[in-house]
């Protein structure tokens, strides 16, 4: 429903806001701006492995916040 979609969007936004600056910048550049890992590494002036790690950690943190809303448990994907 529209209400559920809004609730998910609000939860995702709150989860992104709660991330550390490095994690937030990496996930926004990837998922919102659509940059490649290589482009993000250039923008953030760090190795590509660091970018991959930051994006992974950001996605995990967001997933943890979404679990109660989506009715999933740890280890499950939606």
Task: Identify the meaning behind each predicted range.
Residues 1-14:
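Acidic, proline/glycine-rich intrinsically disordered inter-domain spacer in sigma factors
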Residues 13-25, 29-50, 64:
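Helix-turn-helix DNA-binding module
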Residues 24, 59-78:
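Short, Lys/Arg-enriched C-terminal cap helix and immediately downstream tail that follows
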Residues 2, 36, 72:
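Glycine-rich ATP/GTP-binding catalytic cores of kinases/NTPases
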Residues 11, 54-57, 61:
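Residues within the DNA-recognition helix of helix-turn-helix
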Residues 50-53, 76:
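Intrinsic disorder/low-complexity segments
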Residues 3, 54, 66-69:
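Intrinsically disordered and other compositionally biased segments
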């Amino acid at each position: 429903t529209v209400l559920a979609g809004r609730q998910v969007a609000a939860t995702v936004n709150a989860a992104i806001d709660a991330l550390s600056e490095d994690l937030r910048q990496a996930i926004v550049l990837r998922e919102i701006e659509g940059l490649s890992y290589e482009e993000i590494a250039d923008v953030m002036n760090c190795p590509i492995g660091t970018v991959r790690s930051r994006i992974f950690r950001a996605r995990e943190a967001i997933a943890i916040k979404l679990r109660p809303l989506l009715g999933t448990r740890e280890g499950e994907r939606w």
